[in-house]
């Protein structure tokens, strides 16, 4: 781990309060830690880069929807170090400020990942309802709280936090739905002999380039758990 004890740490997470990111942060660091709610992935990274006592908690992968590309892209561009990871169950509930019938709902607020993870239920029960993306599910709860005939998708903890009614529990498409979060910081990471390593590589655009790289991992008997292609954002159709 890379958690320094020389100062009182602060942990930035994707808020507002009641988000799954906050839940992951508290599970990893303990509820007595100083937590800072941020409005975006970029804001979390900026906070950590600008403050040596900060750590950040970022959603990186969902068990059903795959990698969170917005996090991946921001991490690649930063100089932060991945210190640790934690996975938590993601149980999604449909919330509203009042106990209203599903047929009365006109708008649903949620993060794009929440929409994707519950799309089968939504298509079956609320197919005609307008879906509006927000930066986090907790933000969606706040939006719904201010909007009549609306609902949001979030955790039971968020429902309690913001005094929302639970219209339907566990609307996620898969019961064993989990999200993996990474902990990022400025400090070097000590080896534990049970580590994961993330690397970004840009190769020449030639036949066999990927095969050549994979051969090096094979020679060193390194197991690869994931390979992802992302645009370099420097030249069109160029990937790392």
What are these regions (language model features)?
Residues 1-240:
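Domain-level signature for soluble enzymes in the chorismate/prephenate branch of the shikimate pathway
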